[in-house]
């Protein structure tokens, strides 16, 4: 197909719609987990530096990501523990966000520490070497 001024915008819209359809699911793989780890480390640093704006953005990202992870594992068999870990970690990210929004960085730090432990606990069960 030759792209012209008329067909190019149509092709872009079709590509965007296809991308949106595929993005509904989440591929829980090493790249996603490394991204989560990076965001959690950034959140920990942002909370320690009392950077409310950056910390809130990281916490929101983790809340959204763990909702997707929970949904992903909820569709699989024999992953009830993974669903529980994802749900608990999502709640901890939400607690951190609430504390950040209240400028309670001590409570946010506690929530982030618990979040990190929750990640490690899940990895002890599910992470493959």
What are these model-predicted stretches?
Residues 74, 127-128:
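Short, surface-exposed, polar/charged, turn-prone segments marking secondary-structure boundaries
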Residues 1-10:
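Bacterial N-terminal signal peptides that target proteins for export
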Residues 22-116:
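Extracytoplasmic c-type cytochrome modules immediately beyond a signal peptide or single-pass transmembrane anchor
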Residues 13-21:
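N-terminal signal peptide c-region/cleavage motif recognized by signal peptidases
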Residues 115-127:
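The canonical Cys-X-X-Cys-His
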